[in-house]
Amino acid sequence: MWIPTEHEKYGVVIASFRGTVPYGLSLEIGDTVQILEKCDGWYRGFALKNPNIKGIFPSSYVHLKNACVKNKGQFEMVIPTEDSVITEMTSTLRDWGTMWKQLYVRNEGDLFHRLWHIMNEILDLRRQVLVGHLTHDRMKDVKRHITARLDWGNEQLGLDLVPRKEYAMVDPEDISITELYRLMEHRHRKKDTPVQASSHHLFVQMKSLMCSNLGEELEVIFSLFDSKENRPISERFFLRLNRNGLPKAPDKPERHCSLFVDLGSSELRKDIYITVHIIRIGRMGAGEKKNACSVQYRRPFGCAVLSIADLLTGETKDDLVLKVYMCNTESEWYQIHENIIKKLNARYNLTGSNAGLAVSLQLLHGDIEQIRREYSSVFSHGVSITRKLGFSDIIMPGEMRNDLYITVERGEFEKGGKSVARNVEVTMFIVDSNGQPLKDFISFGSGEPPASEYHSFVLYHNNSPRWSELLKLPIPVDKFRGSHIRFEFRHCSTKEKGEKKLFGFSFVPLMQEDGRTLPDGTHELIVHKCEENTNLQDTTRYLKLPFSKVIFLGNNNQTMKATKESFWITSFLCSTKLTQNGDMLDLLKWRTHPDKITGCLSKLKEIDGSEIVKFLQDTLDTLFGILDENSQKYGSKVFDSLVHIINLLQDSKFHHFKPVMDTYIESHFAGALAYRDLIKVLKWYVDRITEAERQEHIQEVLKAQEYIFKYIVQSRRLFSLATGGQNEEEFRCCIQELLMSVRFFLSQESKGTGALSQSQAVFLSSFPAVYSELLKLFDVREVANLVQDTLGSLPTIMHVDDSLQAIKLQCIGKTVESQLYTNPDSRYILLPVVLHHLHIHLQEQKDLIMCARILSNVFCLIKKNSSEKSVLEEIDVIVASLLDILLRTILEITSRPQASSSAMRLQFQDVTGEFVACLLSLLRQMTDRHYQQLLNSFSTKEELRDFLLQIFTVFRILIRPEMFPKDWTVMRLVANNVIITTVLYLSDALRKNFLNENFDYKIWDSYFYLAVIFINQLCLQLEMFTPSKKKKVLEKYGDMRVTMGCEIFSMWQNLGEHKLHFIPALIGPFLEVTLIPQPDLRNVMIPIFHDMMDWEQRRSGNFKQVEAKLIDKLDSLMSEGKGDETYRELFNSIIPLFGPYPSLLKKIERETWRESGVSLIATVTRLMERLLDYRDCMKIGEVDGKKIGCTVSLLNFYKTELNKEEMYIRYIHKLYDLHLKAQNFTEAAYTLLLYDELLEWSDRPLREFLTYPMQTEWQRKEHLHLTIIQNFDRGKCWENGIILCRKIAEQYESYYDYRNLSKMRMMEASLYDKIMDQQRLEPEFFRVGFYGKKFPFFLRNKEFVCRGHDYERLEAFQQRMLNEFPHAIAMQHANQPDETIFQAEAQYLQIYAVTPIPESQEVLQREGVPDNIKSFYKVNHIWKFRYDRPFHKGAKDKENEFKSLWVERTSLYLVQSLPGISRWFEVEKREVVEMSPLENAIEVLENKNQQLKTLISQCQTRQMQNINPLTMCLNGVIDAAVNGGVSRYQEAFFVKDYILSHPEDGEKIARLRELMLEQAQILEFGLAVHEKFVPQDMRPLHKKLVDQFFVMKSSFGIQEFPACIQASPVHFPNGSPRVCRNSAPASMSPDGTRVIPRRSPLSYPAVNRYSSSSLSSQASAEVSNITGQSESSDEVFNMQPSPSTSSLSSTHSASPNVTSSAPSSARASPLLSDKHKHSRENSCLSPRDRPCSAIYPTPVEPSQRMLFNHIGDGALPRSDPNLSAPEKAVNPTPSSWSLDSGKEAKNMSDSGKLISPPVPPRPTQTASPARHTTSVSPSPAGRSPLKGSVQSFTPSPVEYNSPGLSSNSPVLSGSYSSGISSLSRCSTSETSGFENQANEQSVPVPVPVPVPVPVPSFSGSEEPVRKESKTPPPYSVYERTLRRPVPLPHSLSIPVTSEPPALPPKPLAARSSHLENGTRRTEPGPRPRPLPRKVSQL
């Protein structure tokens, strides 16, 4: 039976449990579990990491831990009762673990490794804490390290700042908010501004001396030197080096490294230097022989200097090499370091070029104990300590020092009867009172043990030597008296014996007879002469002699012979026990000299403070002893001396001696009667404050009042103890009188000088310190009343000095911080006074920082004592006194401008944060009763309204992101909890007082605005938190967003009809709330939109405002990253609210607006789909197809469905930027054209918008044109750039702006040059299908055609797509996927290459048009693409597989042509047809014939550098050894069985026969051309081909071609053999008449096409000038199955996605035209190395017209590109295939016309061209040999651009939604008198007829500029009849106050729209393509 657990509540899993048993809970080792129940060795509970899943697990798998349970029962919470630091470490490491792995994923390697080390270090420290064997100090140290590392890691990972108290986390509920703020602020400040250490230390380590001439031992002496004061500031660090320049004792680190300690900040200056003096130990002269002298001398060697400035910039451990300078003149040795510092080192030599002193230096900061801990490794090995000279900046009590520093300065000696000066050495001894030398009390420096004697270095031949060597003598105090120092002087001989001869001595006693030590300073000692054998051991013999010249001269002792020799030393005593001051000694011995007491007390102020604190206790005993002796006589003097000593301890240098005085007062003070004299004298001074002129001394007294009161209180206590409490009332009266005097002087106002206010300030500064002393003698209430009266006596007039006001407030602050205030009884007495002064200061906005600090302390105390009843009353007082002023203060300080300086800004933030914390503390402490009293306190509704507005405004300020640092989440959550609690209280007041007739819009709007920004706070978005953090927040506060959302809904429902005031203003804010991914919040808020729509419908009959606001706000919000897929679905769920059973509003008639409501929601939902896709795509770093496609989708949606033109323009520019970033310059130009189309050439002013300045519409359109042209240029789309150049040139021309017109014409010319000169790569096109539900909405289950990048083939494109969609699966087949793929929760990509089908064939079929021009039209403006799949139908014939080889042809039609505003567009329609084997054969032959013609033509015109391609092509067709050649087609389709079984294929069989004959004719001519150009080594192959050709021709039954179509032996520039069609065996017309069109084989037309009025087709009446009609310019013969002749083989590479289906090609691409619709495009062969396609023609029209051949003039009939085949037969044109001479005949269509380049003319009028037109120009029935002026079938580019020209463009239709009309894509058929009305499927729509321009004609002898007319590009930009009816967005336009100036007339003559023969062209009707297109879709 399961029993709830009592104690087993919390445990850690010690072994993983799989949970395979029923109801088992899977656990991993290390998981923590909360246990709910137990049963027979099993527990039931849950893992804390996933509390929603409960289950059972074995009890043996869990280690139980102690825990406390809060809120026992169903919602109990278990907290482990372990060290809080351990708990924090555990939870933090878990959070870090997840984030640490993410660092690796994000490739943040540096932080990854650093965090790994820190985590390991924390784990090690955690083990140490858990073991529990650490000492208290060590545990504290470990916790400090742990928290420091936790804080570092949290900061690096962007986690929250953790508030801590003594290394433990604090619960915000357990402390006041003000205290929480202080903890956070302290940790934040500590993090931002590291504490500056007051103490610094320099670590020095000697490495080696590098010098070439070593060989003697050296002494190296380091010291710190102040170059500013020219003195050393530290002791010396002394070390010895061996002969190699290395430390002599390497095993003793303390001998070669030292720490210069206690350097104050004043010592860290640039003029502090490290000086190094090097002394050698050896011979007198460096060059002497080794054995010359056995005696060793100390001799100067060198000096080095280093400035400490290099160390101030940063800590360095790098080794430094110091230059060592040698002294040339030994007499200057004492100042060599000064000269080097002064840069006077030119007089010194370096010890060597490579010489130097290698040292390591490091500057350390902090207390010496802290340094010992942090650098324990250094101290554990040993390091010597080098002190400062003298005391440190701060003298600590108990510090014992007794160091006498002696500097051996210099000497003056006589020659001693010698011709040269002496070599003097000084030896020093310390001799005690018994005449015995003191052992080991002479220190040369740290690092060297003390010695018993000292030997100076020797200066060679110098009678005035200067040594300046510093020595320390650490002599014990008890050895000082009677001891002296003896200096012995010896001459050092340089002879072989090297003996040292004594010639004199000096001495100096350490202490005088009166007990004073040797005074500091320089002393000139007498040198007493003596002999070598003089016995100096008997000190009594010389101690009677004078030792100093000063004493000697003073005594005027004539008995002693005067001496010229002297010796100077400098002494400095650093002692805590001995003194050199006689006045101090006189005071301490006052009883022996009672007559000197007055003088001694007066001189006390002149004694150095360090001397006084050394004898502090003795001095105080002396003073109170004198007071007891005669208080009447010495009372005032003793009082003044006491004041001086007390104030002396205020100095920072002696501050640490205050505890010494406190100890004295408590333990040693015995003046039981002193309180009377102290009170008396103190009152005397206070009474005279108001009268005294000079108050400096009085202020000194007031400053010392704290310790005076301590003495008074202690004295009274001693008296009470001694007398049993006598005179108590008398004492109380004295204190009362004293404080009354104080209150009187405090109440006085300062007059004139302000000295009184200064005295008041001094008193107030120290008065709070008296409280604790008074409490020792008086009751708490008594003291509180005394303090209240004293503080209440302060003047409240605000014109008092600001300094006094500040001091007064500081006094209030100290009062609040005092022990007195912590008592509830006293606090209730003092609180009104405190609040009164605070109110005054806050009202004047003065001393805000101090006010905030005081308030913080007040609330800290209230929180600590919140359980007491008195606290509620205190809250009442504070609310009544401060709440209003506190709100106003916060509003005031937050509205101030930010300070410029960082310090002021930091101060501003501090004071703001403290006031905010105070307000929050007050509100949190308020109960229902307090809120009720507060609301009832307002007498009028206006006051309540002002208060509510004020507090709502403050709340909005409090939740600003910048209010607290970003990592203060704890503080933010506490603040939000207080705010929402307060709002819930205040919302009732809002409902009760401001509804119905009292409705106030402003206060309700403020409320809703506050609620919205509250919910939207970043710190409340729990979804962004880690699971553990989210769990903690929910457990403590719940989801405050939902609470506030419910409150919003409730308040909204209370508004009633007043809701209309907030529509549509609140739509945006509420929408922002609903975008938060919190289901409960969304469920509450989304129905409000339904309510808004309902009320808006009631008011205005529609909800357009709601709709507009929703859409506008949705875009901006979702762009900011808000909203998700779930929100879209939830928002869509509003639709059921419009059903027959609504859930909210039941009275409205739903049917009136249900439909529009559903439509709105559906529209918004679709917009969200696109916005979500857009946002997700924008998160990707690089620009890819997804980003661009998504932007296009959103752009189109704004235009077509929402008609939001401003948003449309914004997304145009976003798309433009994406294209530029991806270097899609062509697409960028098309994109910008969308905006260009919305503008007109007008002078309407436009506002600033995006990056555009304020300018006119004309200027902006000009700028756009130039930008677009530039992008077309960069994208190598020069043809489109030419059109825009012409358009903008028209504008320049109309304004007579010839300068810019010239530039534009030159730009246009440069584009023509680029077309002809630069190479352009033809891109591949790929069809991509996106299947599956995991794709974005704009791609899901759709298919697109994509334009590939340069050089990008199928494999590369497929890999790129898979990289963009890494989770997608590539489908390996080209079949249509089934429904399961469409609905799959996955991503499937289907990719294969497709062939572009150019819509306009006119340029492609023109003879003589360069390939550079044609290549553009093959792959631009493409709407249709094709893909062929071969298959066998029926039984497959093994002998001839072509009999059953069918082709499935798929045609894809796009919504827009490529290229366009994107590199890919969606497939709008797909058509699938099957091509029969016969149709396939026809297409293959047509393609091969076309290929042959092209190669022959290129060879003739020498475009081909190499004849090999032609050779291979001829060889492949004639010698078809692979698949059998065309004979396989004969076997398959010309046999009787096939003809009888397929009677419907008669025409097709005839066509196939005709193509075979045509191929033979082309081959014959090709061989003739080949023979002319074939190189000699290829002649045998050529001969073989000729022989095989005759065999092949005979197989066709052809002996010779008819005379009229024989191949010409003469070479023509564009020549090709003519085609004979009368050799076809089948009759092609009902009457049996054979129509034979005369044409060049290179302009061979296919049979005529049926005209189609389909909106998506090109002019069906067009026929090709190059080959039969083809739907692809690329795939010419891709359908070639493997096993037949090579006559159809191709050199082109085949498409990889189809199999072979033509007789001779190894690769295949099925390419036949549709069977169900008529083909609309004509194309030519593509020069690209890619699969080419054949063309499937439609059947020939039965009624053919006769062709009248006129051989004589060499002209063959010319095809008009706009006529069907039979119509083209009537107009013969010159042909290069004629049998005439090489002269090319003039085309009749060129007669009478100017010839222009192949670009469209600049239109002067706009038109709306139609698909079909009827020509009004009759055509002659026959060809006349005379050259006359005949109407051209191809309009000239110079005359008016007929619709036939402009309509061929696939770019000229536009979206009518844009408000801009444009031409539809169409083509015009200009016939020659014969109409094929049977083919027409639509009636032309009449439109206005343009007037033609008169065209000059040429006479018969005149030649036009060009030999033949060229067809311009089949499109024209900017041809439109109507300007845009949709105006520009209002936000972008400026109202025009006056009409713009009229445009000047154009300089060009008006162009006539009449034709030359007087007839008028019939304007074509519009071609009704389903989606009209725009200029931007060029």
UniProtKB/Swiss-Prot annotation:
Domain SH3: 6-67
Keyword Nucleotide-binding: no
A single BP term in Gene Ontology: cell chemotaxis
Domain DOCKER: 1199-1605
InterPro entries: C2_Dock-B, C2_DOCK-type_domain, C2_domain_sf, DHR2_DOCK4, DOCK, DOCK4_SH3, DOCK_C_lobe_A, DOCK_C_lobe_C
Modification type Phosphotyrosine: residues: Y167
Subcellular location(s) of the protein: Cell membrane; Cytoplasm, Cytosol
Biased composition (Low complexity): 1681-1712, 1842-1872
Keyword annotations of the record: Cell membrane, Cytoplasm, Guanine-nucleotide releasing factor, Membrane, Phosphoprotein, SH3 domain, SH3-binding
Phosphothreonine, modified sites: T193
SMART domains: SH3 (SM00326)
Pfam families assigned to the protein according to its UniProt record, in alphabetical order: DHR-2_Lobe_A, DHR-2_Lobe_B, DHR-2_Lobe_C, DOCK-C2, DOCK_N, SH3_2, TPR_DOCK
Compositional bias per record (Basic and acidic residues), positions renumbered to this chain: 1953-1966
Biased composition (Pro residues): 1885-1895
Motif SH3-binding per UniProt: ranges: 1797-1803
Family designation: Belongs to the DOCK family.
Function per UniProt: Functions as a guanine nucleotide exchange factor (GEF) that promotes the exchange of GDP to GTP, converting inactive GDP-bound small GTPases into their active GTP-bound form. Involved in regulation of adherens junction between cells. Plays a role in cell migration.
Protein name in UniProt: Dedicator of cytokinesis protein 4
Organism: Mus musculus (Mouse)
Gene: Dock4
